[in-house]
Amino acid sequence: MGRVVLVTGVAATLGARAARRLVDDPGIERVVGVDVLPPRDDLGDVRFVRADIRNPVIAKVLAVEDVDTVVHMSVVAGAGRAGGLAAVKETNVIGTMQLLAACQRSSTVGNLVLKSSTAVYGASAHDPGLFVEDMPPRQLPLSGYAKDSAEVESYVRGFARRRPDVAVTVLRWADVLGAGIDSHDSQLGQYFRLPLVPTVLGFDPRLQLLHPDDGLAAVHQAVVVMRPGTYNVAGPGVLTLSQILRRLGRATVPVPVQGVGTVGQALRRASDLELSSDQVALLTHGRVVDTTALRDRFGYEPRWSTAATLEDFAEATGRGPLDARRIRSVEQRLVAAYAAARGPRGGTHDA
């Protein structure tokens, strides 16, 4: 009898692609895709079950489908079709708790794969040059996706202690960048699409990127090879933010660090971008991780470097100076939103 894999988060592009990749594997008998909303992408032969992982009904899905492997892809960075940031927080944290509770009671689940994020390391002025998997963050993430990811990983570690018979693999993805990736899966991609990009004055952070093909290949390998552990997943090489923006041909507006919070509020009014505190920290201090364990212990070497990932993104989304009228329009909206965020007397101040 072949493997039966359940994939969460298939309404988003990355979850759908993960499920389609797995269903094409001849060693896997069936793939079940779960989400609270119907998928926009074609799932092919994946069996879709509309279910909310925040609801205990997910335990019934595991039992009825006789699932032996769970791939948790629905921890996301930003608001999607399902609602605002409160709904994202609930899905990320409460949804994971319910899913793990269902896995703990299951007699068939023997493999759990979590798509996590290098955001768990945070970003601060005191960070090491490279984060390895067993390093704690120098400054704990206080909000947003980074905090959610850290909480989710803590619940997964607790599950692993209670169910030592289950192989648990945590894949900490660097910031994924690719054409067609949902904004709540790639806040950095949404940021790089801005025609006028705000940067933190006086800082030029080092960044790593991950091509979605490499991230999904690592997920696939975690399902079929089962080498439990925690692994950083990132493309080789590093680029500074200024190098990235030059290669994309984006216009920039440097902002003093004291005004970044207000600019974040302005961006929420002028565009769909949610510039959270963890994103601001990343765009100030950067983050670089070591991928030796991924290569030597897990047995996977990313095929796309950070530079090649950026090049692929640029080719797909366009590069070079954007239309001047569009830049002026965004600039005017940003200035107006900035003024509104500050209030009539500049009453909104950053701490």
What do the predicted segments below correspond to?
Residues 8, 176-178, 200-205, 231-239, ...:
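Glycine-rich Rossmann NAD(P)(H)-binding loop
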Residues 51-94:
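NAD(P)H-binding glycine-rich loop region in Rossmannoid oxidoreductase-like domains
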Residues 141-169:
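Active-site Tyr-X1-5-Lys
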Residues 215-277, 291, 311-313, 320-332, ...:
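Mid/C-terminal beta-alpha module of Rossmann-like enzyme folds, strongest
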